[in-house]
Amino acid sequence: DNDYKEYAMYTIENRAIPCYLDGLKNVGRKILYVMLNDFKNKKSKVAEIGGSLSSKNYHHGESSAMGAVITLAADYNNNVPLLTQHGAFGTRLIPEAAAPRYIFASLNEKFYDYFQDFDVLEYDKDPDNGPEPLTYLPNIPWVLVNGIKGIAVGFACNYLPHSPKDIAKLCLKYTNKENIDNDILVPEFPEFSGKIITEEHNKFKTQGIINRISRNTWEISEVPVGYTREKYFEILTKLMKYSINILHFPKLNN
């Protein structure tokens, strides 16, 4: 029915699927607006930033807002975080952040290197939709920098993160009318030190790092992208239980 259709389109356009122009969901745009106008040169508590979003027509709860602030600021989640983290925001292996009242965020000092042309931004004329612009204008395809994920009714997206330097080089080649058809943009994952293997059809595989310490001891110092420490412990536990000769593994490092 029409109500369901309207809800589906609202979810797609305003919540779940990021905009390809700036790589941001609506809440990310609201956070940047708040940081640029209310906390421009200020390190502020994540709880305070999340709370201020409610005055900018964000209607999905402070907990959701604070989670979005952490996502934009966490180093392990971004090649170029739009916010700078101050405090325990988690790591790739242990992604849990400290309580929002104990951690702080500020606008990344590199923000203006990538986002410009603020004088030509367009704004929604509907006062119920908030004061933030319809989209920000990055000078490289930001949708490729930090990667984006989103799932909604009938739609989904999943872009891998890449090095901004690699993206800029390809953009320059393209604007100089050079052929880039055979250039492969290899992903770059924050806080990942393992291997990225290029396969056919623009597919990629990540590989962790394991080293032999002694005859019966191996050290895993990196796990593939997409695994937290707990997920990898579950795999080792199953291997130890069913077939592989794993006698013991300590839960030591992050």
Q: Where do the PLM segments sit?
A:
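Catalytic phosphate-handling regions of large nucleic-acid enzymes and associated NTPases
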Residues: D1-K203
